Amino acid sequence: MKSIVIVAGGTGGHISPGVALAEVLTELKEKIGYENLYLYSLVRNKNNPDLEQAPCPVLWHNLPPLSSNFFLFPIRYTIQIIKTFFIFKKLNIDVVIGMGGYSTVSSILYGIFFRKKIYLCEQNTIPGNVNRLFFRFASKVAFSLPPKNSKIPCDYQVLGNPLRKKTIPKMSLKFFEKYDTKKKKQFNVLVMGGSQGARQINNIVIALMSHEEINKQFRFRVLTGSALYEEVSKKSKKDAELISYSDNMKEHYEWANFVIARSGSGVLSECAAFALPMILIPYPYAKDDHQMANAKYFELNGAAIVVDQKDEDESHLFRVLDQMANDVNLLNDMSISSLECSHVDASKDTAKYFFSLD
């Protein structure tokens, strides 16, 4: 075996598990027996903190977005595919690991045309279009969550979403703090909208903060997303704790008693590792409604409560928060269920599965 490439483009939901897998593969270099390991990502991700801290060289490509000029898109796309072929041939790439998304297409096509090993990682219960298209060409597929349709035309296992080392808690067992309701302690609520932020969630929480009874029982820390920070700052109270972006999520997970978030696989996996109960507001316009499917998995397993809405009315979330504040046993049970859904060793398990290691 000569070289391995991990193709992780798109959003943080593809990049972070790709870098996590690279961390483990770097440690297993001698066991696997490869010479070189690379990450392959879109040029627009050059400032991504995970890629800036990657444990191996990062190669960049400029695959045009699907929204590009209708007439120029096929030409630009073909040129980038050819460039990928030349780069990978020069580097003697023998194994292609795709983390999902349209930006993996050129790399997977290389694997197909030159008969190289192809391994795929699928983060969602409803697979993305690109992975679905290429499942039959893959030697193995690692799912983060159980697929909704079990008829996958290749060898697959459900192993969890690879987590960065810096995100994994020191203790693999962390149960929810048992609250004494007589102390009337405030609950710490971490609010997240994913790697890009979420205007809907930000606005709902800002509206909640205007209710005095909510402020008495809950303390909010809102990760707004860099692009939405100024907007939220203007709308929120002066004492609101707002953070545009954080590269140290471990600190926030350890602070939180529960989470309000979207339901991308990365966020769900990290919250589960910290045994955090979740209130999930799935992105209503996600492809194939995959965020709702992810959220329902955690709800069915007792780790989450799903709030299904497209508007910014806070009344539904108000009722859920009131329920949680007055039922500590519910929170404790959700915490244990959340931990039971976790896969803190997903990175190592995925590497061992792909490369048939004991």
Curated annotation (Swiss-Prot):
Q: What class of enzyme is it?
A: transferase
Which InterPro entries does UniProt cross-reference here? GlcNAc_MurG, Glyco_trans_28_C, GlycoTrans_28_N
Q: Does the keyword Cell wall biogenesis/degradation apply?
A: yes
Set out the biological process GO terms recorded for this chain's protein. Answer: carbohydrate metabolic process; cell division; cell wall organization; lipid glycosylation; peptidoglycan biosynthetic process; regulation of cell shape
Return the Pfam families for the record.
Answer: Glyco_tran_28_C (PF04101), Glyco_transf_28 (PF03033)
Membrane protein topology class: Peripheral membrane protein
A GO molecular function assigned to this protein is: glycosyltransferase activity
- Give a Gene Ontology cellular component term annotated to this protein: plasma membrane
Q: Give the catalysed reaction(s), semicolon-separated.
A: di-trans,octa-cis-undecaprenyl diphospho-N-acetyl-alpha-D-muramoyl-L-alanyl-D-glutamyl-meso-2,6-diaminopimeloyl-D-alanyl-D-alanine + UDP-N-acetyl-alpha-D-glucosamine = di-trans,octa-cis-undecaprenyl diphospho-[N-acetyl-alpha-D-glucosaminyl-(1->4)]-N-acetyl-alpha-D-muramoyl-L-alanyl-D-glutamyl-meso-2,6-diaminopimeloyl-D-alanyl-D-alanine + UDP + H(+)
- The superkingdom listed in its UniProt entry is Bacteria
Q: Where in the cell is it found?
A: Cell inner membrane
The yes or no answer to whether the keyword Oxidoreductase is present is no
Annotated keywords: Cell cycle, Cell division, Cell inner membrane, Cell membrane, Cell shape, Cell wall biogenesis/degradation, Glycosyltransferase, Membrane, Peptidoglycan synthesis, Transferase
**EC?**
2.4.1.227
Pathway noted in the entry? Cell wall biogenesis; peptidoglycan biosynthesis
Residue positions annotated to bind UDP-N-acetyl-alpha-D-glucosamine are T11, G12, G13, N124, R164, S195, Q291
HAMAP family per the UniProt record, alphabetical: MurG
Protein's job:
Cell wall formation. Catalyzes the transfer of a GlcNAc subunit on undecaprenyl-pyrophosphoryl-MurNAc-pentapeptide (lipid intermediate I) to form undecaprenyl-pyrophosphoryl-MurNAc-(pentapeptide)GlcNAc (lipid intermediate II).
Name the protein family: Belongs to the glycosyltransferase 28 family. MurG subfamily.
Q: What is this protein called?
A: UDP-N-acetylglucosamine--N-acetylmuramyl-(pentapeptide) pyrophosphoryl-undecaprenol N-acetylglucosamine transferase
